[in-house]
Swiss-Prot record:
This is DENN domain-containing protein 4B. Gene3D superfamilies: 2.100.10.50, 3.40.50.11500, Tetratricopeptide repeat domain. The keyword Repeat applies. It comes from Mus musculus. Residues 933-942 have a biased composition (Polar residues). Residues 34-44, 1074-1083 have a biased composition (Pro residues). The lineage of its organism: Eukaryota, Metazoa, Chordata, Craniata, Vertebrata. Residues 729-739, 897-915, 1103-1115 have a biased composition (Low complexity).
Length: 1499
């Protein structure tokens, strides 16, 4: 898959200003004055001097000075009034431009502090008297004014003090808007009111014309479909308009002003812009006479006479637009372009640098975390990948917010935003407005501001301040030189750190906030506020290349950390504020109606309000009725694009504790630091044109100002432009949005895995939860592939129920979310409600993502149209019918009892008559049970007789099994007779398979149920004629096959051996796919049920099962009892007995084993030990060897056996009858095979069922890495993310992604979960040529997933011939039991049959320690002794299972006995020696893994 083109950093470059190529500017283009109350005209000159005169000493106001005689409210003002000896000081000031203006004032208390750096103390009057403002006396400190002046050469546009005033708080006067009040009282004495000095900083200028900015140039010229250039961009580039100004001729150009802005689309998406404003010369010829007079270029007295010594300048802006808020990089780039335009000459045009930056500078990504851009040898900028966080990316600067407002004012603004007040933020620094406004809307996360939001409002849009809705607007402070703010607006001055509100409005009080969260927030912000002065605040555009490469992260990393800490403090407050809100969400549980999306129907407002503190009810009452809270509840109920961020907030809510007065030790906003060896991509400047030999490189481009952009000078991109990607997570397949986990869910799952790894039981359940998560990731593909999708959804619902019963530890809610999403897609709202009820029953509170999918399924799906009344009536009728049937049941029971009594009477009479006749040739009469009695399963040794009642081996078999029943051989034969009697006549069906000594043969049973009461071991009754003929037919066929097989043996032995087949009807049928025989018509319906019904309805099986022989259950072909119960999941999806070819032989068989060899110690590590050794890391493939503690990658071995013939022929189809003259004709009924013998026969060149001839089996072997469920889930999610969920149902999956495929198949088969994977194996294998399909349909060529059998083995598939053979294999060799693979190597003489029997005898007598000691003695001490690849525990366990059958060995009891034996041996030999000789048992974690994943595998 080709790598996607990285997203661009910059999308557009624009130039804004006054349009027109030398043409006069129309006067109607003037910007209209905004509506609102007007102020007096602002002064044209700043204040350059301030003085204090003493009226009592006869001093007069100096010439050119203005005296402050009244307060701001118009009250008479006199300092130190009424005091004896007072000088009656008066403050005066002077305006002008002959010197730099004053920029700051202060009050100095002499003797208590020192003057600030850069300030001058005004200690004398212009007449050389003391300028002390305080009254005379020893108790009053001498008070002086001090000031700071702007630097020399600051220019015309330097900020300075433009106005002064005095306020009297005792008269109710407050600080005027946009003024800064000095905190020191000018009248500190006991007499007289307190007086405070206020001053205003601004830009004093006159002779200015303001016009609306227009677009002068742009690149690229064409709009991109995903991101067209907004038309209002020029207005935002020059928010105060495109001005024409008249300056003195020798005035220097001011420093360019950097500003930022945000454009919000209709869908809420943001576009970030950065502009650089500068001045350039403007021709006088373009001005009309009226415009020239307004600028002061012409005399107002003498009409038409131009004034000299004047220069005309206009303001222009260059800007970039991006989807990324990389403001420092934009500032550096725009500053470079401006310097490039005012310097020169250059060899490259300006357009080359613009196009190079747009096309070749990408936004940082995980593959490119650092990008160093060199624009020139002296201009560099560094782009770093933003901190990975679930919080939305924005241009907010919480440090700027805290620096300019302080902790208390920041909290007050938080309260104003939460209650949706009108906020007007203003400053003289336009680059500060966007950062602070973005922080204001980000501090209320997860709430999203829904009202008008303009961080930098242009002058032409200032009418929004009169809007009757809440808003957050940022504007330049010069707006208030002409207009007063509206009365209902809260004004925030970032330059003076003040909040201004009209007196008639009740001021905001932080006391309405929750007490403890407020105190903690205030304390945290105060602590961080004190650390801000030590951080780096220098301009990044001036940073050198050495600084960017070495010290940038060290210096700026501290600032980033503080930024996250401030954001985390606000986030914790919001989490405490909304703690427990999910408990008051109201899920939809019925068909939607009008008003279903109302907040009152989605959220219990009153209940949530009552759960809060009474002192905060006022705040919550306002908050719950805001637009942003309503939108928040709707997003939580129905999902949105912010679902990942909302889910992260839910995790924060779970972490915080509002009652605590200290923050949690774990920060809510975690920083993911990049590694020190991260990759840095270096981007060089654009290449200069080559210089021809013999010629000099002469610069060609020189500019007097910023030039007009020329399209022919732009460089074309090197690669084809594509759609501009939108910032955010990469796309995923549209068909599978629900399976995708958020980053927060991945973090939680990782922490949960690390925690579970320390607890054995939790680790096993954690792995199990990830396995179920894998299946639900594949569920969409499975649902699309099955005929009945509704049944598949119900199957998934039953899987959820099974997960709850097994107490699975789910790391996330993906399982529920996927099913709810599918319910919504396929219109199953009722099932979605049931899934939600299951979640609540399991104690899981759905997060925002899951809750959204649930409500979508309920709201958007079509509900059943039928009324519930009809269903209720049908239910009542059903109950009536069932009730009547229950009343009739005693009559049936009485009639059956009477019939049984009559039969018993008749049987007793027959027995009495036969005893009288004295006949000894007839067989004993057995009691005939009712045909409806449930069958029970019983197994005997075929080569050896049943164990004696005192046999110690019976103690290991499971309790309740008939294999350990104490009885005589006639009793067993009587039980066989009873079962045959219940079934009726079994027709002869071809030649049987040869019976070896020590093996079992099976007969096929089709009945399941018998009447309660009879006993299979009863005696004293006679066989019926049909059952006797059937039994004789079986014995006869066994004697007629002497030409093809060995002699069967004694009738008693043959009858005992046949018991295995009588007790395995369902397993034989499922393996052999042989059609059932026709049953007599007089059998009851229960006896006519198909053998496959026992697989589909395991609840009807008897509760106790008999033990099986080693010939069957000890082999690798047996289906475990737990595998039968797993098929109950298929009841809701499909019935095997209804599928075509359900009784066909398997076309493909797959053998899988996870047993892996540790090459460090040459030991085999088994499945549960591999699981226990996995690390809780989704990127670690290694496991830990339990013997040597070495790490290695386990392998999953796979062997496929393809039985499909390449060319079926009549000769091959008859090959099954050529070996025996009594074999049935082709196409007739095949032999009666046990599943063991059937599977073993598949290794032979022919089958005796008449369906397949001499077809060779294609065997393929392979081994792939065995992945932990954590690793596999990560890989599967990546695959689905990149290629969509459809890839999981494609036949190319096994070849394209073999590791993922075979691991999925292993886990799904291990947990007995339905999937499409077996069918993909069949579809991916090479079948016969198409020409052969015309010869007729063959069941072997049908791509039916049911014709694929998957066997999971415990041991290795192919044994190592150089190693010592396992004991269970030797047992089968000595017992002459056919095996799948013949042992290829030599067998040591010490491993004899007597040794094996001795080990089994010790195990049966509960003397496991003697068995272990015997093996250790036989093997000898290392390194000279025999080396077993399997541990002692594994050898004894497998040997016991081979002798008794794996379903009849209680492994839990065996583990207890082995543990006791190990402890007993450890007291004499030592634990360390036993571990060296690998005699220890598996760890508790491994045992729990085996127990949690179900029954043990086959071996």
């Amino acid at each position: 898959m080709a790598e996607e083109r990285p997203p661009r950093l910059v999308d557009y470059f624009v130039v804004a200003g006054l349009a027109g190529n030398g043409a006069p500017i129309p006067e109607e283009k003037w910007v209209p004055e905004p509506t609102g109350p007007l102020r007096p005209p602002r002064p044209a000159e700043p204040i350059t001097d301030v003085a204090v005169i003493a009226r009592a000493l006869g001093e007069e106001v100096p010439q050119g000075y203005t005296c402050i005689q009244t307060s701001a409210g118009g009250h008479p003002l006199e300092l130190s009034a009424g005091l004896l000896g007072g000088t009656q000081p008066v403050i005066c000031y002077r305006r002008g431009r002959d010197k730099p203006p004053l920029v700051e004032l202060g009050v100095l208390y002499e003797g208590k502090e020192r003057p600030k750096l850069g300030f001058q103390v005004l200690d004398t009057t212009p007449y050389s008297h003391s300028a002390n403002l305080a009254p005379p006396g020893p108790g009053h400190p001498r008070t002086y004014l001090m000031y700071r002046r702007a630097a020399e050469g600051a220019g015309l546009h330097a900020l300075g003090i433009t106005d002064l005033c005095l306020v009297l708080p005792s008269k109710g006067e407050g600080t005027p808007h946009t003024y800064c009040r000095l905190p020191r009282n000018l009248n500190p004495g006991m007499w007289g009111p307190a007086v405070y000095l206020c001053y205003k900083v601004g830009l004093a200028k006159a002779n200015t014309l303001v016009y609306e900015a227009e677009l002068l140039g742009r690149y690229p010229e064409e709009d991109n479909e995903a991101f067209p250039l907004p038309e209002s961009v020029p207005v935002f580039c020059l928010p105060m308009g495109a001005t024409i100004e008249c300056w003195p001729a020798q005035t220097k150009y001011p420093v360019p002003v950097f500003s930022t802005f945000v454009l919000t689309g209709a869908a809420g998406d943001k576009v970030y812009g950065a502009a650089l404003q500068f001045y350039e010369a403007f021709p006088r010829a373009r001005l009309s006479e009226r415009q020239a007079r307004a600028l002061g270029l012409m005399s107002a007295v003498e009409r038409g006479r131009a004034l000299g010594g004047r220069a005309v300048r206009s303001r222009r802006a260059i800007a970039v637009l991006s989807r990324w808020p990389a403001f420092p990089a934009f500032r550096a780039f725009l500053t470079f372009l401006y310097r490039y335009s005012v310097s020169g000459p250059h060899r490259l045009p300006l357009e080359a640098h613009i196009s190079h930056f747009i096309h070749n500078v990408p936004f940082p990504s995980p593959q490119r975390p650092r990008i160093l851009v060199q624009m020139s040898p002296y201009d560099n900028l560094l782009l770093c990948q933003p901190v990975s966080s679930p919080l939305p990316l924005s241009g907010a600067s919480f440090l700027q917010l805290l620096q300019n407002l302080g902790p208390e004012l920041a909290i007050t603004l938080l309260l104003a935003v939460l209650t949706e007040h009108k906020l007007l933020v203003h400053s003289l620094r336009p680059d500060l407005l966007t950062s602070v406004c973005e922080a204001l809307v980000s501090m209320i996360f997860p709430l999203h501001w829904q009202c008008p939001y303009i961080p930098l409002c242009p002058l032409v849009l200032a009418d929004v301040l009169s809007a009757p809705v809440p808003f957050i607007v940022g504007i330049h402070s010069s707006y208030f030189d002409l207009h007063d703010p509206p009365a209902d607006v809260i004004c925030v001055d970032l330059d003076t750190n003040t909040l201004f509100q009209k007196e008639e409005k009740k001021p905001l009080s932080a006391r309405t906030l929750p007490r403890r969260p407020y105190k903690l927030l205030l304390a945290t912000l105060t602590s961080l506020y004190q650390q801000l002065d030590q951080t780096y605040t220098g301009p990044e555009e001036e940073a050198s290349l050495e600084f960017l490469l070495t010290d940038y992260e060290a210096v700026c990393g501290r600032r980033t950390r503080l930024e996250r800490e401030v954001q985390g403090a606000f986030l914790r407050f919001m989490a405490c504020l909304l703690k427990g809100y999910r408990n008051f969400l109201r899920p939809l549980t019925q068909a939607p109606s009008e008003g279903s999306r109302d907040v009152d129907n989605l959220f219990y407002l009153q209940g949530f309000l009552k759960s809060r503190e009474r002192s905060s009810h006022k705040l919550y009452s306002q908050l719950l009725h805001t637009q942003m809270f309503s939108q928040f509840i709707e997003e939580c109920s129905f999902g949105s694009a912010r679902h990942a961020a909302l889910e992260f907030f839910d995790s924060c809510v779970d972490k915080v504790h509002p009652e605590q007065e200290k923050p949690e030790p774990t920060p809510l906003v975690e920083l993911e630091e990049l590694s020190g060896s991260e990759l840095t991509v270096f981007i060089t400047p654009p290449e200069e044109p080559p210089v021809l030999e013999g010629s000099e490189s002469t610069p060609q481009y020189c500019y007097d100002g910023f030039p007009e952009l020329k399209a022919e000078l732009f460089e074309s991109p090197q690669e084809q432009q594509g759609a501009l990607p939108v910032p955010g997570p990469s796309r995923s397949a549209p068909s599978s949005p629900a399976p995708r986990r958020t980053k927060q869910e991945m973090k939680v799952a990782q922490r949960m895995a690390q925690k579970s790894a320390t607890v054995p039981e939790l680790w096993a359940r954690c792995l199990l939860g990830h396995c179920y998560g894998l299946w639900f990731l594949c569920l969409p593909a499975y649902v699309r592939s099955v005929p009945s999708r509704v049944r598949a959804l119900h199957t998934a619902y039953h899987v959820l129920r099974e997960m709850e019963n097994r107490k699975v530890v789910l790391p996330d809610e993906v399982c529920y979310r996927v099913l709810m999403q599918l319910c919504s897609h396929y219109g199953q709202p009722v099932l979605s409600v049931r899934v939600m009820l299951e979640m609540r029953r399991a104690g899981i509170v759905p997060n925002t993502i899951t809750y959204g999918y649930y409500n979508k399924a309920v709201l958007e799906s079509k509900w059943p149209s039928g009324t519930p009344g009809g269903r209720l009536r049908w239910a009542k009728l059903r109950n009536v019918v069932l009730g009547a049937a229950q009343f009739r049941q005693p009559l049936k029971d009485r009639r059956q009892q009477q019939q049984q009594q009559q039969q018993q009477q008749q049987q007793k009479q027959q027995v009495a008559e036969q005893q009288k006749s004295g006949s000894s040739q007839t067989e004993p009469y057995l009691e005939r049970p009712s045909p409806t009695r449930p069958l029970q399963r019983q197994t005997t040794w075929a080569g050896r007789s049943l164990r004696e009642p005192s046999s110690p081996m019976g103690r290991l078999v499971k309790s309740g099994s008939l294999g350990s029943a104490r009885g005589t051989q006639p009793t067993v034969e009587a039980g066989v007779a009873h079962m045959i009697e219940a079934l009726g006549v079994l027709e002869p069906r071809g030649s049987p398979v040869p019976w070896q000594d020590g093996s079992l043969s099976d007969l096929s049973l089709t009945g399941e149920e018998m009447a309660p009461g009879g006993s299979p071991g009863g005696s004293g009754s006679a066989l019926s004629a049909q059952s006797t003929e059937a039994l004789e037919g079986i014995s006869g066929r066994g004697s007629k096959t002497s030409g093809c097989q060995e002699e069967v043996g004694t009738p008693r032995k043959g009858l005992g051996a046949r018991l295995q087949q009588l007790l395995t009807p369902s397993r034989r049928a499922s393996a052999s796919r042989i059609p059932p025989p026709e049953l007599p018509s007089d059998l009851p319906p229960a006896a006519r049920r198909s053998p496959m019904d026992s697989l589909l309805w395991p609840r009807e099986r008897p509760g106790s099962t008999a033990s099986e022989s080693s010939a069957s259950l000890g082999s690798e072909w047996d289906i475990s009892e737990s595998s039968l119960s797993s098929l109950s999941l298929r009841r809701s999806s499909e019935r095997l007995s209804d599928t075509p070819g359900a009784f066909q032989p398997p076309s493909l068989e797959i053998l899988m084993s996870s047993c892996s060899l540790c090459h460090a110690c040459d030991s085999l590590v088994y499945d549960e030990e591999i699981m226990a050794g996995w690390a809780p890391d989704d990127s670690n493939l290694n496991t830990t060897c339990p013997f040597c503690a070495c790490h290695f990658v386990p392998l999953l071995s796979v062997q496929t056996l393809d039985s499909r013939p390449s060319a079926p022929s009549p000769k091959s189809s008859l090959a099954g009858a050529s070996g025996c003259k009594d074999a049935p004709a082709p196409g007739g009924p095949g032999p009666v095979l046990s599943d063991r013998r059937f599977c073993l026969a598949l290794d032979q060149p022919q089958l005796c069922n008449g369906h397949m001839g001499s077809a060779s089996r294609r065997v393929e072997n392979g081994a792939w890495a065995y992945l932990s469920p954590l690793v596999l889930r990560k890989e599967l999610e990546s695959l689905v993310e990149n290629e969509g969920s459809e890839v999981l149902a494609l036949p190319e999956l096994p070849a394209a992604h073999p590791i993922i495929f075979w691991n999925l198949l292993w886990y799904f088969q291990r947990l007995r979960l339905p999937s499409v994977l077996p069918g993909l194996v069949l579809a991916s294998c090479n079948g016969p040529p198409p020409s052969q399909l015309s010869q007729g349909p063959s069941p072997w060529l049908t791509p039916d997933p049911a014709s694929v059998h998957v066997h999971l083995l415990w041991d290795v598939l192919t044994p190592d011939p150089n190693s010592c053979p396992p004991l269970y294999v030797l047992w089968r060799v000595h017992s002459q039991i056919p095996q799948r693979v013949v042992w290829p190597g030599p067998v040591p003489s010490c491993l004899s049959l007597a040794l094996l029997e001795s080990v089994l005898r010790h195990v049966g007598l509960n003397e496991v320690h003697k068995a272990v000691g015997l093996l250790l003695e036989t093997l000898g001490p290392p390194p000279t002794g025999l080396h077993l690849q399997r541990g002692i525990y594994r050898e004894i366990l497998f040997l016991t299972m081979a002798a008794l059958g794996k379903d009849h060995v209680d492994i839990v009891a065996f583990d207890k006995k082995y543990k006791s034996a190990f402890n007993k041996l450890a007291s004499s030999m030592g634990k360390e020696e036993l571990r060296q000789r690998r005699a220890q048992m598996p760890t508790p974690k491994a045992i729990d893994c085996r127990k949690c994943f179900g029954a043990p595998l086959e071996c």
